[in-house]
Amino acid sequence: MKTNLLRRLLALLLAMVSLFALPVLAEEGEDWEDEDISLEDVETEGDAEDEEIIVSDSEDASIEGLTPLYTTKIKAFVKTGKGINMRLRQDLESDVVTFVKTGEVITIYKVYPSFVLCEYNGYVGYIVRTWIDENMTVLDPENTPPYGVVPSQYVATLTQTSDVHVSPSLDSDVMKIHPAAGCKIAILEFVDGFAKVLYWRSYGYIDASLLTDLVVVSPTLDPEDHDMPIAAFCSFFEYNTGKEGNEGRCKNIAHSADRMSKIMYPGEQMDLNNDVGPWKKANGYYPAPVLINGGSQLGYGGGTCQSSSTLYNTVRQIPGITIVYRKPHGPGCAKYLPMHQDAAVGSSTLNFIFRNDCEFPIRIQAESTGEGTLCIQIFRVYEE
């Protein structure tokens, strides 16, 4: 009896150890624990470490002519944090408009990649998205997309390796990622001869003369042309860095794009861990940085969180698709997308599951050459 009991306890202990050793398919730096420091310290130091905030719109805050979109609360991620500063411009060094305490409600008028333009007790200014609760109230659901949804107007292909500028000017600074020829991008709009894109936690601008095969994204779920996508989104990633695991990460993004490309019929569900994973060598995945027990090491499937997160941002643009299960990469979310817009995969608790509740089939077309971008389009399928 005692021997059997000991064996059972040992088996249970081994099972628990293996459970906690499951890899999280996020690259190093995407997840962290809360620190016992003041919120003001985090605002001036922590954000700069986690995200490169590059803002071309540096005008003073104003809500003149704008319609309120959402209400939400200030959410502190640190034990000693009491609130956050509202800033005059999208700049952590700009003047402080007022101080907003944790738990207070703000009204959001415009959402930017790193900030929200908001009003609080008659004060108007910018607050970093890190410090707001993503579970917010949509004030006009019929005319306002859910918070964080970023619809694209066009999709195009690069004809050559391209710079991504911080503003619509060839004289402006460039980002560190230079997507290669053949990469597809999802375009928000055209500004002064440049394609405006969402680049990590900022906007980027690509010379429009370097684009070909321009496709319009349908503004409705019933496109005029059956070849028009009804949703599109892209994300950017580093390649050819020479860092350990980077090549494997790029291959994993491209491979997972192929595996998630399919037709989904009404009522059909996609479970990323099961349907695009399992994240194993046998399924064609390569070693790349993953998080295991709070540390980073090489593991099969590393980088596919960027694939799941890009897909998450694409399907959210379609009202008939239901998000069944989604978790972010901890409080800070993933750095390659705006705050609150990621979907982690790779463990029993980190997964992305969604269901097609549209009245029609959809076709997911995910494409990546492994050289800088992952672009996902969704098409409505018209059955004969």
Q: What residue spans do the PLM features occupy?
A:
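Bacterial N-terminal signal peptides that target proteins for export
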Residues: 2-10
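SH3/SH3-like beta-barrel superfamily modules
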Residues: 98-130, 179, 183-209
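Structured surface patches comprising rigid loops and adjacent beta-strands/short helices at the edges
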Residues: 129-137, 208-217
